[in-house]
Every structure is written in C-alpha cells, then in structure tokens.
Curated annotation (Swiss-Prot):
The keyword Acyltransferase does not apply. Fe cation binds at residues 15, 17, 45, 51, 115, 118. Disulfide bonds: none annotated. It comes from the Bacteria. Non-heme iron protein. Its cofactor is Fe cation. The lineage of its organism: Bacteria, Pseudomonadati, Thermodesulfobacteriota, Desulfovibrionia, Desulfovibrionales. This is Neelaredoxin. The gene is nlr. Its EC number is 1.15.1.1. It is an enzyme of class 1 (oxidoreductase). Keywords: Electron transport, Iron, Metal-binding, Oxidoreductase, Transport. Monomer. Belongs to the desulfoferrodoxin family.
Amino acid sequence: MKMCDMFQTADWKTEKHVPAIECDDAVAADAFFPVTVSLGKEIAHPNTTEHHIRWIRCYFKPEGDKFSYEVGSFEFTAHGECAKGPNEGPVYTNHTVTFQLKIKTPGVLVASSFCNIHGLWESSKAVALK
C-alpha cells in the first residue's frame, strides 16, 4: 500500500475533516505571506476527548520541482482530558493554525490532517506569483 492511498479527500465546504487552506491566490515572490489552515470551517468538527483532530501538516510543492518541502507540523494535544474523566479537563486546543512563509516560484500548498476516529485527510491549493 502506498501512503497516498491512506488519505481521503473531499470538498472542505461539505466535509468537516478536510483541511481548508486560506491564503491569497497570488503572492509576491520572496515575500512572507500568511496562510491559515483549519478544519470544520463550514461544518464544525467535534473537539472532545473521544473525537478530535490531532494534527495538521503543511507542505509546498514548487511548480516543476520533483520534490515537495515540509512547511510546518502543528499538534493539538489538549481535548478535555482529565483525571476526573473525559471532557472534564480545563483546556482544549482548536484545530486552526496560521503561519507565514515565502516562496520563490509558484506551486501548490498541501495540508494533511489526522482525526483520531476517521483517519487521514488532505487538500491542496495552488499559489501563483504576482
């Protein structure tokens, strides 16, 4: 089995597990720009001890390049766990992250995520240069 066969995809507007990548469609070369990746943007994803998003990972694949590059790995480790019991804890993290990057060529941003119940999901967004 190939790793790519383990990932599910869909439209983030209709499926709560798919990462929504938000950034400008075209950016200036070699200048930092913000990217936000979230899950459940249109349909809320649960955030409980029993059902939650554990991480989001982001990559950039430059146009015409054989290789992709890891941009960031973001873990969400608090989901209401507590010695008192599930969902009794004092802290929760939310499955949204904003970071900045700069690129020298156009390419594709790819985001993957992991739901502890429903597994691996991914999405992508093309980014052009102005």
